[in-house]
Amino acid sequence: VMGDMDYTPLIRKIKELPMITEVMQPDYYPIVSQLTAIGQFDNWEGLDIPIDTPVPVKLFLGKEDFFRFYDITLLAGEWLDDLSTYEDIIINESLARRMGWSPQEAIGKHIIQSYITYTIVGVVKDCHYGAPTLPIPHTGFLVGEQMGLMQRSAGILFKYKEGTWNECRKALEHLYQTECSPENILRLNSEH
């Protein structure tokens, strides 16, 4: 559910559903979502020869709870947290290697996207969140109020017991109809 509302009562009711095993606050959107920002990185620390085509990077919101929800492993550095700034970034290992670094070497390095210089504070293990036949996308994770559009697009992420999706979907649709105003948007994405 997306929209301007107090999510607390809805989250409480979702947690009460017998098929639900975990619920997160509405701070993120699904990693398989099409609601991703794309950054274009064209310079980084140690780049000797300018590149002709910027490296596209899918950007997501992500603090430690997000990574734990998706069971994404931190290979080097630290998680983003409430003290992190918009200039701090966690990248995946494929992006670190594309830039010529091991995960450990990437920590503290700087990458540049037009007018923003990011400091790499963490590197996470690659994970497939697209088709397994496609290469793993270069991915970055950020926090901060400057990510306003991404924050406003956030929804409630949850996990449910295997084999209960149809029952879960029906229960969520019923909650949406009884607990949400028509201005709110219901999007149900199922990840396997």
Predicted regions and their residues:
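Mid-to-C-terminal secondary-structure elements
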Residues: 12-192
